[in-house]
Amino acid sequence: MQLHISPSMRSITISSSNEFIDLMKIKVAARHISYRTLFHTILILAFLLPFVFILTAVVTLEGVNKCSSIDCLGRRIGPRLLGRVDDSERLARDFYKILNEVSTQEIPDGLKLPNSFSQLVSDMKNNHYDAKTFALVLRAMMEKFERDMRESKFAELMNKHFAASSIPKGIHCLSLRLTDEYSSNAHARRQLPSPEFLPVLSDNAYHHFILSTDNILAASVVVSSAVQSSSKPEKIVFHIITDKKTYAGMHSWFALNSVAPAIVEVKGVHQFDWLTRENVPVLEAVESHNGVRDYYHGNHVAGANLTETTPRTFASKLQSRSPKYISLLNHLRIYIPELFPNLDKVVFLDDDIVVQGDLTPLWDVDLGGKVNGAVETCRGEDEWVMSKRLRNYFNFSHPLIAKHLDPEECAWAYGMNIFDLQAWRKTNIRETYHSWLRENLKSNLTMWKLGTLPPALIAFKGHVHIIDSSWHMLGLGYQSKTNIENVKKAAVIHYNGQSKPWLEIGFEHLRPFWTKYVNYSNDFIKNCHILE
């Protein structure tokens, strides 16, 4: 078929190609209809009709035949023809409204909740949920999920607490084997130090370190790292204090594993004449107090409102329940001036540290007449470790605490401390320490919970000289996000916290800084399969 339009736009001729149809001529008066308008109309229809056909086919496939009215068809076709968006935004607004309505409704008792998304979809289909019922079930599922997650987190913290308080099998084996060696091997019982070095133990020309611990492996790392990192190892004297049950094993280790040219002395608490009940009555009271025993050895969850406690707060409370905090070994640092009456200046080290830098310059630090050289713990990049002020350790709702302490005062750290014993002996630090321990016992431990640092923060008030933070980096036992570059630069790194490097819960990427000083070639270490 051919379409012919005359140049004057006054006639249109349609003829068939096979000439079976006669020529058709259409003549239209120009005054009634514009031929140009007619041409444009036909042209537009030629473009639109294919799209209308395609759209109709699509709508048919989507089920337009199910519509029972022209209005239904209009709702389906109208937005497509007019370019309007679908109803998803309106549906979302309606669903938000329903969610707000059910957020304050009480969830019915005995409501059976799906265990998975697929089960939820199946229940919706089988039970013909309306939107409100679906929203209520969804809310109940989310609340149950949050409770389960919270309970799992607290269970994890409890398990971590018990793991941190336990003695690893390898370390227990090491202690037993070395104790047996002490009884059967005369060399393991040799005098420490040798008789010719006994005068050095009270010679203030040497650099005296004090370490109080019942962990033989940890003690070996502290001593080895300090000696290997020192520019003057021949000036180092270590005074190691341990309890009676560990004394034989500790003595055996250092008798059989020399750290020459450094000198090591091992003493048990039972060998100090000064440590009598008359001199430390408050510690006996602490150990025998029923409230203390229940607090440290009782049910760690009883009385704790877990719904109002954050995991971080719960973790801190668990750490404060470590049995080591009522151990005499942990309180011994407050008696250093009496235990070492001939020494003028010492550095006290915890057993969970590693010495990476030369500590010789510490003996040249001027404490300005103060007793205790320590790093602050309220300034630094680490918000978890370096954000400690007195409010983090004390209960300021207690009138005595509120009266004597400032909650915003910066705290300082134990772990690596320089003690001027001459200045210390002129103070009443020990008496103040005992006095506040008694007050806390009277208050049934309501003034503070966390170990030996709180009474020390009070007792040393006004006697602390702040040293540069590069000397002592804390927190390697708290979190895995510790900055590795800062770890490498620190003179002393401190694994304070539950994740000790000798435990399986220790952080793998931080452990090598500690294991570097473990002598894995030692027969006792190998036979006890330490950290294997």
From Swiss-Prot:
Class of enzymatic activity (EC top level): transferase
Gene Ontology BP term (one): mucilage pectin biosynthetic process
Cellular component terms per the entry's GO annotation: Golgi apparatus; Golgi membrane; pollen tube
Query: Topology: which residues are Lumenal?
Result: 62-532
List of glycosylated residues: 305, 395, 444, 519
| GO MF assignments | polygalacturonate 4-alpha-galacturonosyltransferase activity
Pfam families, alphabetized: Glyco_transf_8
Q: Which InterPro entries match?
A: GAUT, Glyco_trans_8, Nucleotide-diphossugar_trans
Where in or outside the cell is it found? Golgi apparatus membrane
Q: What does this protein do?
A: May be involved in pectin and/or xylans biosynthesis in cell walls. Together with GAUT13, required for pollen tube growth, possibly through the regulation of pectin biosynthesis and repartition in the pollen tube wall.
What protein family is recorded?
Belongs to the glycosyltransferase 8 family.
* Record protein name field: Probable galacturonosyltransferase 14
Species per Swiss-Prot/TrEMBL record: Arabidopsis thaliana (Mouse-ear cress)
Gene that produces this protein = GAUT14
